């Protein structure tokens, strides 16, 4: 099962961010000099619907302790229905993580618009604290899970 928090644990969090909304909110948060956790590595994708099972599972198998997916609010997708596809895929991914005995709380989906820099900082910081409490990813370096 899950590892408990270890002293000195520094989580590795991957953030897949929609180019049109969440990535722009990250830029706004940075230019507003908001305090944001340094444990997040942001990867810009054109739409949150581009994040598939392979991207998420590969990140976990390669040592990510948590994954944060950021997309446009439902109904505001630049590509019309992309975030609806994301929401369905996210629900399936949570089930897959549970099957792998990896706490589904290590994966989070948040809708953050381009003007929500404060919300972006809040979501990132709260998710980082959640991952710190969960401890290191138990799948990291284990080829047999």
Residue ranges, per PLM feature:
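Iron-sulfur-associated redox domains of electron-transfer enzymes in respiratory
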Residues: 1-145
